[in-house]
């Protein structure tokens, strides 16, 4: 199977998000990379589902709460930017203050 670098990045992100999802389900608090991966994957999947950039910017803030992550993680993540593919092309989605 031949994958482009972008496809490899998306696959890596999905794998990291899947691991984060499983750890969260076990009651573990997520670290920085796990939190970023889970929120980013939610944005990518939302774009695939046909949601708008505005919807994803809003929904991206609801993926995780402070209780879901280790101490200090919310302060480390001021913005998450994800280049997502929409039906009308690729767009940059920025989620501001993703962990409330």
From Swiss-Prot:
Alphabetical list of InterPro entries matching this protein: Urease_gamma (IPR012010), Urease_gamma/gamma-beta_su (IPR002026), Urease_gamma_sf (IPR036463), Urease_subunit (IPR050069)
Primary enzyme class: hydrolase
GO molecular function, one term: nickel cation binding
Enzyme Commission number(s) from the entry: 3.5.1.5
Keywords: Cytoplasm, Hydrolase
Subunit text: Heterotrimer of UreA (gamma), UreB (beta) and UreC (alpha) subunits. Three heterotrimers associate to form the active enzyme.
Family affiliation: Belongs to the urease gamma subunit family.
PANTHER family documented for this protein: UREASE
Official protein name in the record: Urease subunit gamma
Species this chain originates from: Paracidovorax citrulli (strain AAC00-1)
């Amino acid at each position: 199977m031949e994958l482009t670098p972008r496809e490899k990045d998306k696959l890596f992100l999905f794998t990291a998000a899947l691991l984060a999802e499983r750890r969260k389900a076990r009651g573990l608090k997520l670290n920085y990379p796990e939190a970023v991966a889970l929120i980013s994957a939610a944005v990518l999947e939302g774009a695939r589902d046909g949601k708008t950039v505005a919807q994803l910017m809003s929904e991206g803030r609801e993926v995780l709460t402070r209780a879901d992550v280790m101490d200090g993680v919310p302060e480390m993540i001021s913005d998450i930017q994800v280049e997502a593919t929409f039906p009308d092309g690729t767009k940059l989605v920025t989620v501001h203050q993703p962990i409330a």
